Amino acid sequence: MDWLLATPQLYSAFSSLGCLEGDTYVVNPNALAILEEINYKLTYEDQTLRTFRRAIGFGQNVRSDLIPLLENAKDDAVLESVIRILVNLTVPVECLFSVDVMYRTDVGRHTIFELNKLLYTSKEAFTEARSTKSVVEYMKHILESDPKLSPHKCDQINNCLLLLRNILHIPETHAHCVMPMMQSMPHGISMQNTILWNLFIQSIDKLLLYLMTCPQRAFWGVTMVQLIALIYKDQHVSTLQKLLSLWFEASLSESSEDNESNTSPPKQGSGDSSPMLTSDPTSDSSDNGSNGRGMGGGMREGTAATLQEVSRKGQEYQNAMARVPADKPDGSEEASDMTGNDSEQPGSPEQSQPAGESMDDGDYEDQRHRQLNEHGEEDEDEDEVEEEEYLQLGPASEPLNLTQQPADKVNNTTNPTSSAPQGCLGNEPFKPPPPLPVRASTSAHAQMQKFNESSYASHVSAVKLGQKSPHAGQLQLTKGKCCPQKRECPSSQSELSDCGYGTQVENQESISTSSNDDDGPQGKPQHQKPPCNTKPRNKPRTIMSPMDKKELRRKKLVKRSKSSLINMKGLVQHTPTDDDISNLLKEFTVDFLLKGYSYLVEELHMQLLSNAKVPIDTSHFFWLVTYFLKFAAQLELDMEHIDTILTYDVLSYLTYEGVSLCEQLELNARQEGSDLKPYLRRMHLVVTAIREFLQAIDTYNKVTHLNEDDKAHLRQLQLQISEMSDLRCLFVLLLRRFNPSIHSKQYLQDLVVTNHILLLILDSSAKLGGCQTIRLSEHITQFATLEVMHYYGILLEDFNNNGEFVNDCIFTMMHHIGGDLGQIGVLFQPIILKTYSRIWEADYELCDDWSDLIEYVIHKFMNTPPKSPLTIPTTSLTEMTKEHNQEHTVCSWSQEEMDTLYWYYVQSKKNNDIVGKIVKLFSNNGNKLKTRISIIQQLLQQDIITLLEYDDLMKFEDAEYQRTLLTTPTSATTESGIEIKECAYGKPSDDVQILLDLIIKENKAQHLLWLQRILIECCFVKLTLRSGLKVPEGDHIMEPVAYHCICKQKSIPVVQWNNEQSTTMLYQPFVLLLHKLGIQLPADAGSIFARIPDYWTPETMYGLAKKLGPLDKLNLKFDASELEDATASSPSRYHHTGPRNSLSSVSSLDVDLGDTEELALIPEVDAAVEKAHAMASTPSPSEIFAVPKTKHCNSIIRYTPDPTPPVPNWLQLVMRSKCNHRTGPSGDPSDCIGSSSTTVDDEGFGKSISAATSQAASTSMSTVNPTTTLSLNMLNTFMGSHNENSSSSGCGGTVSSLSMVALMSTGAAGGGGNTSGLEMDVDASMKSSFERLEVNGSHFSRANNLDQEYSAMVASVYEKEKELNSDNVSLASDLTRMYVSDEDDRLERTEIRVPHYH
């Protein structure tokens, strides 16, 4: 009552949706408008306290108002609105706000409690079968109303799936709410089980399978995966594996000897396996012709006696089983198949339609007959299978639309057997139990049990879909092998963290209980541990040809599919247990694998690869591959059912995600308080997904019934895996980055096992030939480090619980490292030696190889003189990898040091060498470990300096490095070490070459090859994608990391896979080389790995790769001739990487500017000219433009080495016009050219003269190069258009302008050889020429200027050029595009634009 008084409007709104009149719920005609209002209030409620939905929960409006409306509304719009509101109300609490933050206050905790109560009561309301049935029927109605679903209808279906997903996601662990029916039950009833049971009764499985395969599946693909994951949420994978193993065993025994299977299983296995077997009557009429001659009459009697006790559906099931054997005594499989069909069809309508039953069953039968008539007699079985499964979707008036699409789609891609077992949903597993207790005689009971077991077995066999029988026995044999590649491996998955190898032993024991010949001696010779249960079965089955066997199983699968006619309607009131749900899901698993799995994985994979804005949790994809691929391999389904999963593309994506998640995990681990659980879970799922992928390849390699296409596909896949260096290196990376403090031991075990399986595949693929094989010994060398072996030792510590296979993986690696590679020293670690001693003392059963290894290592250790303690790994190795320790010991920053750094920076800011001063200050205070680069990176990380300043400081480091490398007694180096005149002359990229020479000199050339390979691979991927090919030509593959980064338009990481590469990233010359080449360092990108910019073109990457050293043309994956031509035609793009190119650019950092007020604005123009020059012209040897310290110029995209389009040529016309019109006697045209082609630098302009000067006198007017035009523009800019006192005599002018011309003429006459000798004169002349520069508020003005006539002439020529070439813009705007000025500098001084020719 209090609630009603507090929220009368809310109560009024919900109560007016409808009311109960007698037994009928009447919907208010205005219900839709009320629902829209409720939805609006729900959407715009308080985003923190969520008061509206809390009020709904308090008023129990979900149960009292929304659910009745959902069950009784007939209007589609009302149903849609109700479902949308329910979806909103059942959203998990975590999606509404930050639970961690809300838990900190009492109000927040109370809010969370009330919202959880709302969710729990909502889930409780959906335990009623009518509520879920309304949602399922609504989906069926939408699908049947129109085969071509509109986007709106697709959205409606997605909302229904979202509602089911939200309901199943709600946890049941809250103690404050208990279902009333749960209190009276001894063990309690799971609401989850009840909802799942109801959904499967309502044929949700068929609906889901249809939605997975229909053309519009992209709309709900992600939601579907989430729903499937929640359906399997509480199902331990080992449970389903055991059930499928039993099923598989029964299948093998029945298909080999029918008579034997009638008697053997009950004798040997009824005690252990009958509960599961007898609850699984998946075959109503599949085996009766061959099995049931002797018991047909007894079954008829028994069935007749119980007609009143079982449901109508149960009657139909029993009668079908009893009738068919009598009708068909010849035992022919084909005959029983057809007869089973024919006898069921007339029987179903008569006996399966009770008065109170919903009409969809009767409609279903009518539709089925219509379908059969329409399809005709041809391929009757196959068509029926498809039709039956999809016709059950609902009481449609247009069933053809619903069934036609998927049937055609499936039949086009798979053979008829693939359409199989829609119907054996675990609905049937529970049919036999009801009649059994009321049977009169125990013998009849036993007969029924036997029959159920044998018939159950027959349909299991069908799932194998044409597998050749001889191999089936081999599959079971190899399960117990200690060879890692066989079936034993799945037991080491993440879900079995406490089971390990033991689970497989359990499986084998349960398998043996239902096998026919446990005592057969043939099983023991080869394999010691598990008995070879199935070996004897190979002999009888080999009598049939493989094709006959395949056909037999196809028939059985068709029949199994038809058993879906007997649904779970008779068990509506059944109370489901966990075992019931497990059996249910076992059946659905087979249907899902046969019908929807490949579609769902393919759809999700496509959405993950697309650059869609919708974020998708990748863990669902990993889970799909991990969880179901093991079942597909266990049942050895035909390759056509998993051909979209076992592809290079899927494995490539998993590899890329492994690298990406490794980096994300480390970045988050460095941030205090970040939640690592999602990253750890995804990381573990990636590893297990790769393991199941490789395990499936290995399993199918041993299957004998594959056709040639499947074998070729597997062979090709193995060759691609052997070429994929990223995959094999991924496990080196993950093992090195293993951290016991955050990772679980199960994750470590999965890493070791998966790596072992991969190595076996690599070893076997080397024998296939056809590709360049890798050298396994070189690869294994990467594991021969102290820390990796330390982690192997951690795993070996638990050798008693690991299981034989995991121990086998560990010992194999140690054997290779200690024996083949001879690096036994890395095994001399306490954790390994102690474990060896324990194994030795415990007499643990080991094969001879491992015993020899232990003995050899211990003996070698005892006889090897001890080394220094530093070589023994300490516990610090377990905290992080070696390079991480190095980084943190050498460059770790305490909070005090970080605070001190800013103070030191302020103190050093006016010093020429800022970083050197900071290093000195740290050193004075006792900290001698700070390197120059680490200080620069820390300055950037703390935002003390901008990216532009960081860029210039790094250039300064380049110069420092070059100075220390090249200092000679004759070189006049300044205090800051910036003397580049001699060394840079004639060598524009000299700094890169110097770094390369030093790296090679230090014997680190292999790291240059590593970097070169990455660049070449990126180049190859870009070329392939540019050509529009998804698959590269030839046998080459695109490496996963480069391919996916480029596809997603992300920068490509330079992954340091092994220890050597990580150490190289701490080697200063290599880091400087990366910086010089334009590769983003980790500090730049805020990441663990350095990165190659994604905007680089293939030509750029190829040019940089050539810089690193000669290319091995034989190993290139592409034709380099085009790229060779491109690099040869435009060398400048590889010699100039913007403002970071040359070491000489750093000379501006320590220049002492004389009169900054007088020259403040000149560097603006110079920086622009420098930028345009660097980007647009081919430089001559000494064209080195310096960057002034007062203006840190930088492009908007840092590091871009691409050339810009050439500068517009209108200035050439200006020069021609000027020379043609001049009347004064001031020299010949070469004067003008000389004056315009000279590049002069004073302070901000650098200290070199353009080489064009020496050629200017002989350059004709028609061959003016871009440098000339740029330089002329520079001078015109200085001299302005508002020159008042200049004469009109051509290049002649006033004293100032003539002094400039004279200066430049001198430079022209001096020639290139005297360039350096002119510098002092140039400096003096330039300074005097600018001494009279005055700044006012509007423009530059001089005492002596050019005349206005010249200005007007220039403007007119400019206008003509503008008319002639409309796309050319002014040079000013062109330079503006190429040059981005620094915002900070603009604020520091008043910027006065130079007027341009107006």
Curated annotation (Swiss-Prot):
Residues 273-290, 522-531 have a biased composition (Low complexity). GO terms for molecular function: DNA binding. Its main location: nucleus. Residues 365-375 have a biased composition (Basic and acidic residues). GO terms for cellular component: cytoplasm; cytosol; nucleoplasm; nucleus; perinuclear region of cytoplasm; replication fork protection complex. Keywords: Biological rhythms, Cytoplasm, Nucleus, Phosphoprotein, Repeat. Disruption phenotype: Mutant flies show loss of both behavioral circadian rhythms and molecular oscillations of per RNA and protein. Residues 291-300 have a biased composition (Gly residues). The keyword Amino-acid biosynthesis does not apply. It comes from the Eukaryota. One of its GO terms (biological process) is regulation of circadian sleep/wake cycle. Phosphorylated with a circadian rhythmicity. Expressed in head, photoreceptors, lateral neurons and glial cells in the lamina and medulla of the optic lobes. Expression follows a light-dark cycle, levels show a significant decrease at the end of the night and then remain low throughout the light period (at protein level). Residues 338-355, 400-421, 440-452, 504-515 have a biased composition (Polar residues). Required for the production of circadian rhythms. The biological cycle depends on the rhythmic formation and nuclear localization of the TIM-PER complex. Light induces the degradation of TIM, which promotes elimination of PER. Nuclear activity of the heterodimer coordinatively regulates PER and TIM transcription through a negative feedback loop. Behaves as a negative element in circadian transcriptional loop. Does not appear to bind DNA, suggesting indirect transcriptional inhibition. Belongs to the timeless family. Forms a heterodimer with period (PER); the complex then translocates into the nucleus. This is Protein timeless. It comes from Drosophila melanogaster (Fruit fly). The lineage of its organism: Eukaryota, Metazoa, Ecdysozoa, Arthropoda, Hexapoda.
